[in-house]
């Protein structure tokens, strides 16, 4: 095929929706470049959810999961599924035992903090209640710092989740101590004021006080404030973290816990840090945080990035802040350091309260740099992520989502033009999961802010090429076939190319 370079363009949250549905921001926007490539290049559809990406059946996919499946070239059993299978038998876990023994010896309180949600993207409330119950059985007082979702779930599902969670906490000495919307507790874009506001409620009980979590949520709903944006609050007579206490970070996904964990450990410029005795996380978060964890990470051999390195080729990863970790850490399946020959470019995301206020985000700045790198012809593989469809889709604002679609489409046209002008270069356009193609939940009569179960597109800018439907783990083998590189045995995905006659970039 004589392809020397592949540009893998991941349109984050761009799923295959119902055409001409009034809540499909893609079809509403009628993006011209998208219509062109969909009509003129080989295409197929990929499954991006459930068992096809290593999640429980019927579970929506997400960006972490999607990028790991794409980058590894295999179905990766995800943290949610793994913990579901193993959490019932974690009593013998060495790090958990050490954590419990430290609390017992000092008569400390266990502070469990995490997203109390059934969304399954960053955490699951059943994991948190199981941990609370197992720890309280040792005579340890447990307090919960509940983060509310409304982003990977319906915007006003928090009340129901908290009610169910409260019933599931069996320990007599277990209760909810603080409540915070994830907008504050789980920021990942260096909006430190948000993180500090959540931290001060958790560490020092410095926040408005309410009698119980349900009434707090109801009061916010009455003021049109949904789960994600509920300001940190103290519940009852909670007094804060004490030196003899322990902290357990219950989210299994790392990216939205790094800032809070960094403040807890005194690794930021924030001066007033509460002392505590021990800390533990559900999964490994980040090497330099040095937090013990319950479930060790899975190692991956012969990923796409590794294979490109092994063939002594160069690769580029480029994204704006919101998705930078996905094209680097997650795409490389948990490897923090770049591969040899891997260049990384971070484009700062705009500093706005929510991205419906600036739907184009930093897509144009990103594209300018990307086009420059495509023309350089330095790289065998370029991986780029456009965050707009997902980040604006999460706001539930359909008009803004349509603007986001058009902004990305404008960028896509520039990328396609650059690829056409570069010899022996192919463009792949795909997505990691759906979102922006469904902006309203008609059944519940509420904006749809979560991901979808829809398949995602896969388009290759090659003539005379036939594709078959597949799943995200088939993308890496397809890229290797285009580049004429043998697929490693560890890659269990299969190329999506079903037939080649005379393929050339176009």
Swiss-Prot record:
Substrate binds at residues 122, 151-152, 182, 188, 253-256, 323. NCBIfam families: pgm_bpd_ind. One of its GO terms (cellular component) is cytosol. Its EC number is 5.4.2.12. Pathway: Carbohydrate degradation; glycolysis; pyruvate from D-glyceraldehyde 3-phosphate: step 3/5. This is 2,3-bisphosphoglycerate-independent phosphoglycerate mutase. Keywords: Glycolysis, Isomerase, Manganese, Metal-binding. The active site is at residue 63. It holds the Pfam family iPGM_N. Mn(2+) 2 binds at residues 12, 63, 432-433. One of its GO terms (molecular function) is phosphoglycerate mutase activity. Monomer. The keyword Manganese applies. Belongs to the BPG-independent phosphoglycerate mutase family. Mn(2+) 1 binds at residues 390, 394, 451. It catalyses: (2R)-2-phosphoglycerate = (2R)-3-phosphoglycerate. Catalyzes the interconversion of 2-phosphoglycerate and 3-phosphoglycerate. The keyword Manganese applies. It is an enzyme of class 5 (isomerase). One of its GO terms (biological process) is glycolytic process. Its cofactor is Mn(2+).
């Amino acid at each position: 095929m004589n392809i020397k370079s592949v540009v893998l363009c991941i349109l984050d949250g761009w799923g295959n929706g119902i055409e001409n549905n009034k809540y499909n921001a893609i079809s509403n926007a009628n993006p011209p470049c998208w219509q062109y490539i969909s009509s003129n290049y080989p295409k197929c559809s990929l499954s991006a959810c459930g068992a096809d990406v290593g999640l429980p059946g019927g579970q929506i996919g997400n960006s972490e999961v999607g990028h790991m499946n794409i980058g590894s070239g295999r179905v990766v059993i995800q943290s949610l599924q793994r913990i579901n299978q193993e959490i019932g038998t974690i009593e013998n876990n060495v790090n958990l035992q050490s954590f419990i023994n430290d609390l017992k010896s000092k008569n400390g309180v266990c502070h469990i903090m995490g997203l109390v949600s059934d969304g399954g993207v960053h955490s699951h409330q059943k994991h948190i209640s199981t941990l609370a119950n197992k720890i309280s059985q040792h005579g340890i007082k447990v307090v919960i710092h509940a983060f509310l979702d409304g982003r990977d779930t319906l915007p006003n599902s928090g009340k129901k989740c908290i009610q169910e969670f409260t019933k599931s906490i069996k320990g007599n000495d277990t209760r909810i101590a603080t409540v915070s919307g994830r907008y504050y507790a789980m920021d990942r874009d260096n909006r430190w004021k948000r993180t500090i506001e959540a931290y001060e409620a958790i560490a020092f009980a410095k926040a408005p006080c309410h009698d119980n979590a349900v009434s707090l949520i109801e009061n916010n709903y009455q003021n049109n404030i949904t789960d994600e944006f509920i300001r940190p609050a103290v519940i009852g007579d909670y007094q804060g973290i004490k030196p003899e206490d322990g902290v357990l970070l219950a989210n299994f996904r790392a990216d939205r816990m790094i800032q809070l964990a960094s403040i807890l450990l005194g690794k930021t410029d924030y001066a007033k840090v509460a002392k505590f005795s021990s800390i533990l996380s559900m999964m490994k978060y980040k090497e330099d945080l040095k937090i013990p964890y319950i479930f060790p990470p899975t190692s991956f051999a012969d990923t796409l990035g590794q294979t490109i390195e092994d063939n002594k080729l160069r690769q580029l990863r480029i994204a704006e802040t919101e998705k930078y970790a996905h094209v680097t850490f997650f795409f490389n399946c948990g490897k923090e350091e770049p591969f040899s020959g891997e260049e990384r470019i971070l484009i700062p995301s705009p500093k706005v309260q929510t991205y419906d206020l600036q739907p184009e985000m930093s897509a144009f700045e990103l594209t300018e740099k990307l086009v420059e790198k495509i023309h350089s012809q330095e790289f065998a593989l370029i991986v780029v992520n456009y965050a707009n469809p997902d980040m604006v889709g999460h706001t539930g604002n359909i008009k803004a989502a349509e603007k986001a679609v058009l902004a990305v489409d404008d960028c896509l046209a520039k990328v396609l033009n650059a690829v056409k002008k570069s010899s022996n270069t192919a463009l792949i356009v795909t997505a990691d999961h759906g979102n922006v193609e469904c902006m309203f939940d008609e059944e519940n009569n509420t904006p749809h802010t979560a991901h979808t179960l829809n398949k995602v597109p896969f388009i290759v800018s090659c003539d005379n090429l036939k594709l078959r439907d597949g799943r995200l783990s088939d993308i890496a083998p397809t890229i290797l076939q285009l580049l004429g590189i043998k697929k490693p045995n560890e890659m269990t995905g299969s190329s999506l190319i079903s037939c080649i006659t005379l393929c050339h970039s176009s």
